[in-house]
């Protein structure tokens, strides 16, 4: 009999959460991660499912996600412990046929529940499904240190944050040409911040929560982790630049345009036109 803990999706979640903790992005129970699956992914492991799956209603219906399974991190769970006990810290859930709630099919033992940011995740999944024609499957939230630091010293608007991150490392424009969305500070774990994040996810694969963290979206766990890692590396460079007195020279507007043409991407117009 196949064991679900050996599946590609459980093993992928173990690696992503462990790597994020080692990066210092997910202290204590900080951060959350969800991966949209297909029925064919989970069907071989039905023997591992709970005999009586718990049902939890959603705070608002998600009809676009009806009958869709996900693997999610748990509320109050530490990323560093996922590798030690996947079943206690992760869960496979499946949205019901009307999108009004979900059943916990596997994991989240001892009456654990999914991440408190589940509304933000599911709303963002809905928008990324539409924006990418179903390609994006992952939503990752973490407390990337240098990205958080920048929200204290840069004006919190999409064009400026995007432009500075593009200048911090040449690869950034290629990796996230659509730029980085940013919210005002909001109370986490609410439908309101979930809706605001999802609205930005219509246009951007990265969304900053000032003084808190970042949301990233991508087609795979590796791609999503790499997206955040790339932005965080640029933010680290910028933090060092500002601590050394600021930029003396940088990548110019003309060079950014040339970079986009070379790699066949269309950079966010407002960031290109900023100066």
Swiss-Prot record:
Pathway: Carbohydrate degradation; L-rhamnose degradation; glycerone phosphate from L-rhamnose: step 3/3. Pfam families: Aldolase_II (PF00596). It catalyses: L-rhamnulose 1-phosphate = (S)-lactaldehyde + dihydroxyacetone phosphate. One of its GO terms (molecular function) is metal ion binding. GO terms for biological process: pentose catabolic process; rhamnose catabolic process. InterPro entries: Aldolase_class_II_sugar_metab, Aldolase_II/adducin_N, Aldolase_II/adducin_N_sf, Rhamnulose-1-P_Aldolase. The active site is at residue 117. Binds 1 zinc ion per subunit. Catalyzes the reversible cleavage of L-rhamnulose-1-phosphate to dihydroxyacetone phosphate (DHAP) and L-lactaldehyde. Belongs to the aldolase class II family. RhaD subfamily. This is Rhamnulose-1-phosphate aldolase.
């Amino acid at each position: 009999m196949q064991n679900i803990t050996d599946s590609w999706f459980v093993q992928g979640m173990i690696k992503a959460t462990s790597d994020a903790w080692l990066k210092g992005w997910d202290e204590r129970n900080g951060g959350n991660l969800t991966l949209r699956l297909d029925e064919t992914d989970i069907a071989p492991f039905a023997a591992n499912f709970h005999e009586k799956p718990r049902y939890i209603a959603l705070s608002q219906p998600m009809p676009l996600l009806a009958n869709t399974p996900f693997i999610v991190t748990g509320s109050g769970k530490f990323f560093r412990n996922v590798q030690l006990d996947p079943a206690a810290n992760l869960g496979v859930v499946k949205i019901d046929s009307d999108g009004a709630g979900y059943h916990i099919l596997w994991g989240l033992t001892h009456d654990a529940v999914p991440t408190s940011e589940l509304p933000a995740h599911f709303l963002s999944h809905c928008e990324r499904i539409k924006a990418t024609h179903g390609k994006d499957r992952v939503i990752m939230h973490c407390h990337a240190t240098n990205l958080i630091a920048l929200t204290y010293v840069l004006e919190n608007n999409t064009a400026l944050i995007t432009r500075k991150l593009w200048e911090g490392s040449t690869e950034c424009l290629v990796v996230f040409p659509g730029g980085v969305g940013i919210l005002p500070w909001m109370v986490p774990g609410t439908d309101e911040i979930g809706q605001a994040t999802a609205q930005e996810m219509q246009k951007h694969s990265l969304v900053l929560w000032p003084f808190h963290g970042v949301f990233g979206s991508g087609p795979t766990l590796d791609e999503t982790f790499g997206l955040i890692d790339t932005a965080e590396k640029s933010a680290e460079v910028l933090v060092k630049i500002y601590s050394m007195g600021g930029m003396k020279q940088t990548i110019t507007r003309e060079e950014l345009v040339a970079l986009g043409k070379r790699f066949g991407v269309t950079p966010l117009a407002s960031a290109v036109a900023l100066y």
